[in-house]
């Protein structure tokens, strides 16, 4: 299948890691719901403290005006979504936000820029920002798009810990969502990131009119990366008026929980992050996601330009569920 060929040609699965065919992952999705969640919960407890949640804060440091045509994204210059373009923020403004994030319990500060990919002059500014955030004692993560040769090394030298570069969706469904880049382009940048010694944050989006088999294809593609991503954000589509996917078919909540569980089973040592779309989830649905193996969230009232639950609400939910922020002391 295309997903398998792309993986083998671009990033070969490690022989010590179980290889996940699309058919094998699809079979997991077909597992009876409660049995699937139970299996995922067992695997989660084997590798992580089940009472801790890793907290990250995400900030848009350059907003809007992106030339890409991603059908889900309100930051594309091709769509009229009401997003106001904003050039790269001043380092002092970013540091002020990072200090607030740390004071509120975040251990990682993630920065996103709406570029197809950064130019060399952008990297100079971004490395300055990374150094400043790193000096606060926070882990750093960046999502800046497709990288040219040498850029990942520059980011690593500046102190970047993680690079986020999502696969978005299954290779078979990719052209239905994005036309300005190829699935292989994502794999190419991920290869550069790994070669530079950076940790990888790589996930995708569900609810973009994909089939269950295509959801399985996304998870298989992620699980077969070598090595597997340290962090796997699973996003539920946030429908934004003006984007091509504004009228996408609603995904049943159990299917999203299944996706979390399958991600946990296939990537047992990765952090599985409950990402975009969480503001539209009930507390009960989020609790099921945590039971199914999600152990990381974005903490803060914005995810780039979309809404996210407020910190007070997250603190209350964590208290109800007897969960606490992950620290070096309570990490398994």
Swiss-Prot record:
Query: What keywords were assigned to this record?
Result: 2Fe-2S, 4Fe-4S, Biotin biosynthesis, Iron, Iron-sulfur, Metal-binding, S-adenosyl-L-methionine, Transferase
Its annotated pathway reads: Cofactor biosynthesis; biotin biosynthesis; biotin from 7,8-diaminononanoate: step 2/2
Per its UniProt record, the required cofactor names are: [4Fe-4S] cluster; [2Fe-2S] cluster
**Cysteine disulfide partners in this protein:** none
The residues that hold [4Fe-4S] cluster are 66, 70, 73
GO terms of biological process kind:
biotin biosynthetic process
Its Enzyme Commission number(s) read 2.8.1.6
Ranges for domain Radical SAM core:
51-278
Write down the superkingdom of origin: Bacteria
As to how many cofactors bind and how, the note says: Binds 1 [4Fe-4S] cluster. The cluster is coordinated with 3 cysteines and an exchangeable S-adenosyl-L-methionine.
The UniProt entry, under Gene3D superfamilies, shows: Aldolase class I
**What are the binding positions for [2Fe-2S] cluster in this chain?**
110, 141, 201, 273
Iron among keywords: yes
Q: Which GO terms describe its molecular function?
A: 2 iron, 2 sulfur cluster binding; 4 iron, 4 sulfur cluster binding; biotin synthase activity; iron ion binding
Class of the enzyme per the UniProt entry, highest EC level:
transferase
PANTHER family documented for this protein: BIOTIN SYNTHASE, BIOTIN SYNTHASE, MITOCHONDRIAL
Subunit architecture = Homodimer.
Function comment: Catalyzes the conversion of dethiobiotin (DTB) to biotin by the insertion of a sulfur atom into dethiobiotin via a radical-based mechanism.
Q: Which family does it belong to?
A: Belongs to the radical SAM superfamily. Biotin synthase family.
Output this protein's name. Answer: Biotin synthase
